[in-house]
């Protein structure tokens, strides 16, 4: 059975944008459960713990402050990596803007992209305090397994370039393959 959770982004152990530190760092254990409102997938319309859903599986979890075209491109590439994986994996995008406008844009994106392996959700930033997401990080990508962060990528506004997307996607594919 294949699991899906987005974000979330393998063994290089460095952040592409090294000048911003956001989220749990490489080698640290994730702080635990949280329940975003899922906008697609089997739990669409419900608050569901993605951390719990994926357990010890390899996961790419992406946190973003707002929807954007570059974010959609990243999610599309991660969707390809997750669907190509042979084992149980998770991929998820969690946006910390729960506004109606953000929800509508993200739901439209998830539907148009026909996401199958990637869950898109929203949650208020204050409900994510334990994850220590930096305010100046527009996107934070946590690549983890067994609930331990293996790779962390963090990007300020404008830093999620095509080159950065390629690097994150390569790390995700390696992580999913167990390399």
Question: Which residue ranges define each predicted feature?
Answer:
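Positively charged n-region of N-terminal signal peptides that target proteins for export
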Residues: 1-4
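Hydrophobic h-region of N-terminal signal peptides that target proteins for export
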Residues: 8-17
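N-terminal "domain-start" segment that seeds a small globular fold
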Residues: 19-48, 69
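Short active-site neighborhood of thiol/selenol oxidoreductases, capturing the structured segment around
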Residues: 47-72, 89-92
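Thiol/disulfide oxidoreductase modules built on the thioredoxin-like
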Residues: 54-56, 125-165
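Loop/turn elements at helix/coil->beta-strand transitions in domains of secreted/extracellular proteins
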Residues: 55-60, 86-91, 115-118, 138, ...
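Structural microenvironment flanking redox-active thiols in thiol-disulfide oxidoreductases
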Residues: 67-110
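Short, internal strand/loop/helix patches
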Residues: 109-134
């Amino acid at each position: 059975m294949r699991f899906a959770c987005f974000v979330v982004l393998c063994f290089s152990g460095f952040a592409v944008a090294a000048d911003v530190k956001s989220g749990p760092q490489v080698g640290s254990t994730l702080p635990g459960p949280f329940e975003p409102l899922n906008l697609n997938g089997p739990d669409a319309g419900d608050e569901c713990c993605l951390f719990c859903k994926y357990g010890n599986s390899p996961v790419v979890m992406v946190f973003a402050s707002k929807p954007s075209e570059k974010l959609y491109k990243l999610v599309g590439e991660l969707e390809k990596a997750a669907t190509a994986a042979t084992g149980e994996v998770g991929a998820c995008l969690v946006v910390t803007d729960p506004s109606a406008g953000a929800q509508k844009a993200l739901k439209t994106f998830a539907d148009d992209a026909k996401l199958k392996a990637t869950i898109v959700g929203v949650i208020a930033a204050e409900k994510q305090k334990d994850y220590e997401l930096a305010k100046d990080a527009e996107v934070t990508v946590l690549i983890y397994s067994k609930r331990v962060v293996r790779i962390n990528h963090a990007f300020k506004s404008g830093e999620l370039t095509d080159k950065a997307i390629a690097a994150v996607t390569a790390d995700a594919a390696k992580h999913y393959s167990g390399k």
